[in-house]
Amino acid sequence: MLDLFHGFNWDLGNIEKCRKHGVSTDEVESLFESDDLRIEPDIANSKIEKRFNAIGKTAKGRSVFLVFTIRNHENEILIRPISARFMHKKEIDYYGKENSRI
């Protein structure tokens, strides 16, 4: 999945939003290396820019829910994380029925 993008667009704002929920930048980035990554458009929250929801496991094996957008910065396509949090047990159970690896 990462081969479609040039990297990530981090700043203090989105780093802090992820840290607030205990998720590091390394964990967010490792989601995109996961074989079980699921990405869906977030239509309800895409009024200003297209947003996406992603779920998957980090390199540490922790299930994470991520909201992100795609940015074009200096002719590079970047993933811009907006917020990330660990998935609740109910979410893991729900998505686990569809994808047993999450």
Report residues per predicted region.
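Ribonuclease/tRNase effector modules and their secretory precursors
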Residues: 1-102
